[in-house]
Regions:
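A short, Lys/Arg-rich alpha-helix, primarily the initiator
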Residues: 1-24, 28
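Short coil turns linking two alpha-helices in DNA-binding domains
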Residues: 21, 32-35, 52, 66, ...
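Short, basic-rich loop-to-helix N-cap that marks the start of a DNA-contacting helix
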Residues: 44-61
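Short C-terminal boundary/hinge segments that cap the last helix of small helical domains
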Residues: 61-80
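Active-site-facing substrate-recognition patch
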Residues: 82-153
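PRPP-dependent phosphoribosyltransferase catalytic core
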Residues: 84-98, 231-308
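Short, glycine/charge-rich flexible loops or terminal/linker lids adjacent to PRPP-binding catalytic cores
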Residues: 170-214, 224-228
Length: 308
């Protein structure tokens, strides 16, 4: 049995997920726009006032929401419309978690060697984060909130984790958004429409259109590798317009160029700039290290040439 507060909370979360205010959802459902106002939730004598069965039925119908989906909103973390300050706080929260779990490392004196063979004073391993439950849960709640606010739950049919590091994040976020998940391989396995995809992706969504799929990955440097996943999803019949990463380097111009060429809007929890801000505010590293890292972030090629 659910409480009065839980039912109203679920209605509020459903409204946000569908892109409405409570009054907007009431109006969309053919009800008086004040039906879901907070003042209407308590009777004049102070007793709880529940939404009527008829009004709830209209809401579920107009939003194409099943009762089981509605109930799932009760157990979810609050999904709220985010402003820039909210997003900045999320970015710093994620940056701090990555530093605290040593998923981000700074080393100016003995730079890391990247896959390209070039040197870098910073290193990021988002896969490490999955082993830290509290930090992971905080970031995944924020990720679900960000995606819901920026894109809208009703505009996403399926979440697709990219092999391999994107798979756990796809699972965590899809669970919070109560959405199906698939994962996409780097290379095909077998033949046919779903040769590069594991899981079930129907040919059409409830509206009869191609399913709207968002790609989930752990990080993005220049975005070049995303093309493999996005093209595989599109070849399988998906509409892909958005990608989400926990961490975006945000220092390579090619990142935006590659996303624009693919017609993708990138969403990210945090970047190197947020990590640098948090490291400086909390005195995680000495001044020399921070200045060298900042020089790298502003001009990676120049820094690498000097380090060679």
């Amino acid at each position: 049995m659910f409480t009065h507060e839980q039912i109203w909370t679920a209605l509020d979360r459903l409204a946000i997920a569908k892109g409405y205010s409570p009054s907007g959802l009431a109006k969309k459902s053919g009800l008086d726009s004040t039906s879901f106002n907070k003042s209407k939730r308590i009777s004049p004598d102070g007793k709880p006032r529940w939404p009527s069965t008829e009004s709830l039925s209209k809401v579920l119908t107009v939003t194409d929401t099943t009762m089981s989906d509605f109930i799932s909103f009760i157990d979810q973390e609050p999904l709220t419309a985010l402003n820039e300050n909210d997003k900045n706080n999320m970015a710093k929260r994620a940056a701090n978690a990555l530093i605290e779990t040593q998923s981000v490392l700074f080393n100016v004196k003995e730079p890391f060697t990247l896959k390209s063979g070039k040197k870098s004073p910073v290193y990021i391993d988002c896969r490490r984060l999955i082993s830290f439950v509290q930090e992971r849960n905080t970031l995944m709640n924020d990720a679900a909130n960000l995606i819901s606010s920026d894109i809208g739950r009703d505009k996403i049919d399926i979440l697709a984790g990219g092999e391999t590091a994107g798979i756990p994040y796809g699972a965590y976020i899809s669970d919070r958004l109560n959405k199906p998940m698939i994962y996409v391989r780097k290379e095909p396995k077998g033949y046919g429409r779903m040769a590069q995809i594991e899981g079930h992706m129907p040919e059409t969504n409830k509206s009869g259109n191609k399913p709207n799929v968002i790609l989930i990955e752990d990080l993005q440097t220049d975005g070049g590798s995303k093309k493999i996943f996005i093209e595989a999803l599109r070849d399988a019949g998906a509409t892909v317009e958005h990608a989400f990463v926990v961490f975006h380097y945000d220092i390579f111009p090619a990142s935006k160029e590659n996303m624009d060429a693919l017609g993708i809007k990138l969403h990210a929890l945090t970047t190197w700039w947020s990590v640098l801000d948090v490291a400086r505010e909390n005195h995680y590293f000495d001044t020399e290290t921070l200045e060298s890292v900042e020089a790298f972030l502003k001009d990676p090629i120049k820094w690498q040439d000097q380090a060679a």
